[in-house]
């Protein structure tokens, strides 16, 4: 596995762990229920990033899938970090962090879709 892919797997693992921790914390009081959304987003995008890295290892254009994974992880970090900070500390990460993170996740998903489209027309690898 290349270094970039390995670092993305590390990032995804840490993101998934953070999602589980937030989900667990969210069960300890009604005031922490707002942690459910960032927890779910972290877990879902960690799994999606792992899948994108796995696909990249066999793809004809691996850079698209690695970029998609990075954008998904960076976006979910911003989005979930901002929503979690507002729930826990009543402070924002920085102005527009959640919308920037959400937009970054969307772009990551669209790049994954473009990667899938390019694989439809790629020469078979044997």
Region annotations inferred by a language model:
Residues 4-28:
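N-terminal signal-anchor transmembrane alpha helix
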Residues 44-52, 104-115:
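Hydrophobic cores of alpha-helical transmembrane segments in multi-pass inner/ER membrane proteins
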Residues 1, 118-126:
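Short, charged juxtamembrane terminal tails flanking transmembrane helices
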